[in-house]
Amino acid sequence: MFPSASLEYSPNKKHDFKVYSFRKVSRPRYNSVNPFQIFQSTFSTIEGDPKLLPATRYYIAGGYTYNKMYTAELFYKKAKNGLASLIFQNNDNNLLQFISSNLDENVAYGIDFTINKSFSKFYNCYFLASFYNETSNFKNPTTNIEVDQQQFSWFIRNSNSFSFLSDQSLSADINLFYSSALIAENAIFDAFGAVNFMMRKTLCNKQLSVSMGIEDIFNQGNQFNTRNYQDQSGTSLTKGENRLFVASLRYKFGNSKMRDNKKSKRVDERNRI
């Protein structure tokens, strides 16, 4: 049994209270339980663990929404045997090992603030700020000793949509994301963020759409993390193609304004009944 429950109370149109909870189970994939050691490069390997256990996640939250636009929500989540790919340095063999493992326990609690409001006919804003404390426990395979990590983290996400022209056929989106240092698996990631910009123009009675934009304008989405505990002292930098110019062209084929072809007819005989 994996029960989910929710309770909502709205005394009037402007106030809404909600409490909900759920429990989920995730099972390891085949490549995570593969016991063979695969060399990714001369000095790094990928390893599975056939003894992996299913992961169980619990989540409970309660919040208040005012006027369907402003929300504050407290949450608590706990994961047992979380599935993760942990990075360890084998100092004896000079290898960097990516090992599929179970995190013993991961607990986080905090508060979310959300604003979702149309300030005018031409401007809509979504804003999310989350503040939480997280602890993670796992076993170091090289020493067989428990490792405890703790971190207070926060992040913000902001989406701004603008509409231009009388028919609102021209629009622009500016999206921002920023995260402070956070725990992920057996590493602590430094702060990172990104700013995206997109413009869209619709033509031909909204059947044709042309979009252009830039993702991660300031190229700040690279993620640097450290692993400093017991016999581990390592760093990693995830450097991808973050800053991108994107363009798209879409056209809706067919009749996008289908009408009901149901015919109505007047029967004179009915008027006499």
For every predicted segment, state its role.
Residues S21-R27, Q37, K68, Y76-K80, ...:
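Transmembrane beta-strands of outer-membrane beta-barrel pores
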Residues Q149-I273:
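Conserved C-terminal beta-signal and adjacent last beta-strands/turns
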Residues M1, T56-I60, Y66, E105-Y109, ...:
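Residues that define the transmembrane beta-barrel architecture of outer-membrane proteins
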Residues V25-L74, K78, L96-G110, N116-S118, ...:
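Outer-membrane beta-barrel signature, preferentially recognizing the C-terminal barrel domain
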Residues A5-Y9, I60-Y66, I111-K117, F131, ...:
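Residues on the lipid-exposed face of transmembrane beta-strands in outer-membrane beta-barrel proteins
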